[in-house]
Amino acid sequence: MDREQILERLKALIHERFGVDPASLNGATTQSEIGIDSLLMVDMMLDVETELGFTFESMDLPRNPSLDTIVDLVQRNMAKQQA
């Protein structure tokens, strides 16, 4: 799965969970711009695991991560599990 596919899945998940228009989201969009707190972010990351079929080794996210940062984390964890 490439970066753009992961980003599109994240945007769809954010739309489903929080009602945010996917067209208003891009890679630079941050957690605070979406309007979710850190607990909701962790909950969403668990949904990402389920949706994409892998398990995060670590969910070490910086404060207020962008969607690009989350995509990077997803790609790293998916690559480790496919190796």
What does each model-found stretch correspond to?
Residues 2-34, 39-45, 50-83:
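Phosphopantetheine-dependent thiolation modules in NRPS/PKS and related acyl-activating systems
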